[in-house]
């Protein structure tokens, strides 16, 4: 009986080398004062206004080092370590209209376990049209002999790590966010990316919302990009999540079947 190798990957983010012009939330947590997400957000905004073209070589250097670590360890599908991002969520948001990174809003998160000031949603969310994924993917893939996996945050996770001052309707907000994610995915597909990970750890924390919004996310994020392998990443801490993953698989198959039938017709 022929054995099939189980392919390996990493979740996504890696610590940033100190020579980079940015730090992320978790890098700041390693400092003496602990995690300071507000400071990191403000500093990244300032960096965006004053970044240099020469910084690109530093990002490529960091990505190359991080990819090499994974390849040397035998990882089949490496990531670039998300080295261009201040965290795995807000980098996507910075490419959308509707977000305010200048006037942050205070919020209490994680069932009261954490409080901070977050970027605010002050108008309708839509993509600016300046897609980041093609450049980031091509730059990283050029450094790897194996296929690079690209990571994008899911709508629920974005919603839980930003301050909604406009929608007051989680379903509408989720729909608009899902549309921006789908646009980035389409551009990744055009560039030849074959492994895309949608990060949705909030599925496990907000199971009711996951049930309410998951089918819409499947339609807007997954089904429109059938030519690639897309993984939904979450932390299964609720027994309902285990049941829901079975439903997701069934819904994906149904959506694919309906999509193909409609294409034939």
Give the role of each language-model region.
Residues 1-265:
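Domain-level signal for soluble alpha/beta catalytic cores
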